[in-house]
Amino acid sequence: MTKHKLTTNAGAPVPDNQNAMTAGPRGPMLLQDVWFLEKLAHFDREVIPERRMHAKGSGAYGTFTVTHDITSYTKAALFSKIGKKTDLFVRFSTVAGERGAADAERDIRGFAIKFYTEQGNWDLVGNNTPVFFLRDPLKFPDLNHAVKRDPRTNMRSAKNNWDFWTSLPEALHQVTVVMSDRGIPASYRHMHGFGSHTFSFISPDNQRYWVKFHLRTQQGIKNLTDAEAEAIVARDRESHQRDLYDSIERGDFPRWTMYVQVMPEKDAEKLPYHPFDLTKVWFHKDCPLIEVGVLELNRNPENYFAEVEQAAFNPANVVPGISFSPDKMLQGRLFSYGDAHRYRLGVNHHLIPVNAARCPVHSYHRDGAMRVDGNHGSTLAYEPNSYGEWQEQPDFAEPPLAIRGDAAHWNFREDDADYYDQPGRLFRLMTPQQQDELFQNTARAMGDAPEEIKRRHVGNCAKADPAYGAGVARALGLKM
């Protein structure tokens, strides 16, 4: 028998949790039944706004262990020596679906990592694909609206989805990945992760390197066909979450090997493709993979809402030695993610335990809704001042970044219009069976989209490789 007795939020004993207070056994309820009022008022507010994207997620705690030396590229403390361990929290997710969506749907998967370092939290907010649909964040709300529910029917719309994707030819690379055999991972454990964006390393001698992060699963890649996924969804909508949770509970801890691709700052100008374009990858022949360490997940959360639903990842959270790049999608996310968290969780979401830094924090910010720490007590609230409080730290300033050009709404399609080379290369890397799966998956996904949209997609595919376009056309039953 538990010794935990029921109380109100104020700590008073609850004498009856079975019957509301009424005037007589059949009379009306009384307003003075404060336990009923408290219980129902809390119930009415239990649901917080869901994430606009990545709403359905699963999480786990673990560690990152350095296995190889990269200190010549970065002064970040978590990479400072071989054998160093850093605690972390990971949230996996589907992207387009709501909180109640099935895990085994054809979709990108989110792969967000919060490293609790001694220099602050570093959030690597990535996906299971190395590229994305867009390279300009101004179109991100449009992507969201295209893949979410139609405002009239409240149903997902292949017409809306494919009309948008095919109208942006730069999306073809990501579309090819999502429609391939890797579009439905068998589980979160059996997929790779990518930082996707170009970030930067700052070295001990204050030199800048451009960097991309890769996480390769040690469990091996496993995927589902459409038919296999449909059978799983019919019996278990939480298949990915169940697989992750159960594997950790039985001690079968999933692991990923971290690699980086590194490029000296000046070399970015020499590449034949745009190094800060999120719709493109860096070729391994140009920037080979460099092994860094191992990520292991070994502890499940105790409370899903507190630790997974309230987790807030923000690519703006970096530490000394890791920074940003001119990648426009990354720069757009630097604002959008924090802003979304302030709406969803409140301005003090950084105080929620799963989000809280584990190093000393001496932030300038105070007050605001749900401030639950000491709010800096009587410490003065302005800077500069005469008392040495809130001192800035110029030793951690980054080297200057050279930029050039006039301010304007530049059409990047005039700067780099090659959207087809890399999707074509990816297509030609596939086996004939994988290519056929790509054709058939695309045809099923396009569903009842109008023929003009289907023909537009076939045209985009043909520019990547004539065989790609011809195969999709055959699967769609189109005569070209």
Curated annotation (Swiss-Prot):
Residues in coiled coil: none
Stored CDD domains: catalase_clade_3
Entry keywords, A to Z: Heme, Hydrogen peroxide, Iron, Metal-binding, Oxidoreductase, Peroxidase
InterPro entries per UniProt: Catalase (IPR018028), Catalase_3 (IPR040333), Catalase_AS (IPR024708), Catalase_clade1/3 (IPR024711), Catalase_core (IPR011614), Catalase_haem_BS (IPR002226), Catalase_immune_responsive (IPR010582), Catalase_sf (IPR020835)
Cofactor: heme
Swiss-Prot/TrEMBL catalytic activity: 2 H2O2 = O2 + 2 H2O
PROSITE patterns, alphabetized: CATALASE_1 (PS00437), CATALASE_2 (PS00438), CATALASE_3 (PS51402)
Active site (record annotation): 54, 127
SMART domains attached to this UniProt entry: Catalase
BP GO annotations: hydrogen peroxide catabolic process; response to hydrogen peroxide
Function statement: Decomposes hydrogen peroxide into water and oxygen; serves to protect cells from the toxic effects of hydrogen peroxide.
Listed name of the protein: Catalase
Organism (species): Nitratidesulfovibrio vulgaris (strain DSM 19637 / Miyazaki F)
Gene: katA
